[in-house]
Amino acid sequence: MANNVNLLYGLPQRVITLPANLIQSKSKIFIGNGDPNCIIGNNCDMYIDKNSNRIFYKCGCNWLLTGTIMGDNGFIGLRGSKGDTGNKGEIGDNGENGDIGQIGDNGSIGSKGIKGMNGFNGSKGIKGDKGTDGIKGDKGQDNFGSKGQKGETGSKGDDGIKGITGSKGFKGDPGTKGENGINGTKGLKGSQGDLGTKGDDGIKGIIGSKGIKGDPGNKGEDGIKGTNGLKGSKGETGSKGDDGTKGITGLKGTKGNSGSKGDDGDKGIQGLKGEFGTKGNVGDKGDTGINGEKGSDGDKGNKGLDGIKGDLGDDGIKGDKGIKGLKGDTGNSDKGDKGSKGDSNFSKGGIGDKGSKGDNGSKGESGDKGIFGLKGSKGDIGDKGEKGDLGDTGLKGSKGLKGSKGDKGLVNVKGENGFVGDLGSKGSKGDKGESGDKGDIGIKGDKGAKGVTGDKGDKGTKGFIGNVGFKGDTGDKGIIGDNGSKGIKGSSNNKGDKGDKGNTGDKGITNTKGIKGDKGIKGSKGDLGSVGEKGEKGTKGDIGTKGETGLKGIIGDKGELGSKGIKGLSESFIESFYQEIPGTFVSTVPDGAVFGYLSAAGGGGGGGGIELSSLAGGGGGGSGCFYLLPLTVYPGSQFTGTIGQGGSGSTISAVLATKGSDTVINYGTLTFIAHGGFPGSSTLELGGNGDTVTYPLPVTPAPGGTGGNMTNGSNGSTSIFMFSGAGGGASGLNSGFNGGNVGPYVGGTSSPQIAGGGGGASAFGNGGRGGNTTQAATKGEYGSGGGGGSEFSPSGSTNGGDGGDGFVRIDYFMVPR
């Protein structure tokens, strides 16, 4: 069965002085290969199978399997503390906003809409046949009137709720700008007739003052952004739309004398056509005017569907043939001020039908530069004048017709739809979605679940090795050796009664007189005689255990011959937690701790009183107790719970005795309960029963002792790391009965009189004494039962003694070095 069975002594333990100096049986730990044989070991011994790391506990003649050593897994559980970080995962809820970010992608399409403002170059109007240059006449009174004031830009209309973008429709006739607000009314623009042959230049009129540019209208508030509609598929290129409706023909101006044509200014708003001036003499051929610069092509916008072809404009009225004037002096070719660029938002009138070529007027002399009359809307092409000198070829300013690029403005209207696209930038909210990534951190919190794995570490009943702690009790004898140090004090008795002054001798430690105390060491001879007992008288000195000054008495450690349990104490013991005040408690596992040894008691049962004359009450029962129960612990974790209070003794007949309350210890998912003892009876002379414990071990705890019934209470029992409480003794007329015992602790005594029963003992204290005719019942201690009350107690007191309060003690150890 078990081979190479070795007795193990060197395990790290501490000699623990428990509240009442409990001396436990000398448990042993055996280590071998395979299951233990029933012939080895005694009750409460432990056996560890090296092959399987299983732990057995001997109970009676049987070895009970209690668990396995799994300490290593327990260390993995330490990581569970990181689980706290998981709380941040809640921030991840914001990540849902990321979906809105996709709408932002549509917004980028809207930016292309801005390019739409430039649009495709409007289809250039069909250039009319170049008319024969007429004879340059006197510059007519083609007064370029002051530029009409630019209509104020209408306030931008509130953007309507953006509807779902429909499929792109065909380009319709340019209409007034819709949702972007009503444009200010523009002066009537004459429809542009087809370019005819250039008539004689009239006298250059004085350049009219530049019209005041209207103030831009207030921008309307943006409307509520509608959801972006589905982008329509790009339509097929439609057939070229008809020219737009012909604009209203401006009033025909009088023909002015042809002057030298000045450089074409930028095309301004077309004014009223001036009247033809009298034909002047044909002037000298003017220098060929500088061709106007070709306007730069606008950025190519997304090609929109071609609009429906506008109706062909009516043919312009053929202009009257101008009289050929004398060639005027060459007019100043000063380039006119650049006219304000026409508002591109307005619909361009369709190009009128090509007018008949006007007759060339006779070239008259260049007249004085006339005042620039208001530029009338381009009138009907006059009759083709006589062919003038080639030089009369006007500046290609007619190319100013390229101002038709203003049609791009029409495309702009389309482009403004692109502005709606800007709202798509709202998709930036999608960036918030990135903060949603923080939610991933929340996933880290799952690691906290590993902390549960740490509970597996609790299985690491490796601490069971702590049974050697029982052995440590032997070390308690070493504590008795401390009494031996008192014997050293007894050595000072060699000096006689002055030994009491030995307290002042402590002062002598500061003085050289303390050296005389060294002579006291010779008093070790006192070990031989009962002089040491006199040292017990020195217990008075205990009052001033200053005798501890005789720490030199540590020499008495020699009495610790069996102090093998002390080995490793200084190396592995960290600290102890102890509380005996009833109520809640919290103990935090210190740094470095790996093992904890739990000792605890519940509240003892209260002693019974009397109800009828000549009767006394039974003693209360003792509580269940834990003793050095080993646990695997983790630094920073906590033991919490409640310490039980002793039950109240009975008071006369009005209030019966009560049961002691339980002591509850919680650690992680584990719960340990030391149940309180039962109260003594006040009516039937019965003692209260002792109680037991509840713990998460695969064994049944020993039952509590039974209260006496005209007998002494029965003793408590023991099981793995626990003791049950003893029963209280019964009361009697001629003599009461004693409470039961637990280990070295005895039940409360009674007396051969009408007396209450003695309280049952606990594993840590004696039971309370029963009351009689000369003494009152006493309280129990450390979970033992209170004594029963008696009718004939002094002053007529009949109260039973209270049960002893419980306590909790936890000793923490590190890994042995």
UniProtKB/Swiss-Prot annotation:
Changes after translation: May be hydroxylated on lysine by the viral-encoded procollagen-lysine,2-oxoglutarate 5-dioxygenase.
Glycosylation sites: 106, 121, 183, 345, 360, 483, 709, 712, 715, 772
Every Collagen-like domain range: 83-142, 145-264, 268-327, 352-411, 430-489, 512-570
Subcellular locations according to the entry: Virion
Keyword Transport found: no
Region (Disordered): 87-107, 120-458, 479-543, 757-804
Gly residues bias (residue ranges): 757-771
GO cellular component: virion component
UniProt keyword list: Collagen, Glycoprotein, Hydroxylation, Repeat, Virion
Segments of skewed composition (Low complexity): 246-260, 480-494
Entry superkingdom: Viruses
Chain's role: May participate in the formation of a layer of cross-linked glycosylated fibrils at the viral surface thus giving it a hairy-like appearance.
Protein name per UniProt: Collagen-like protein 4
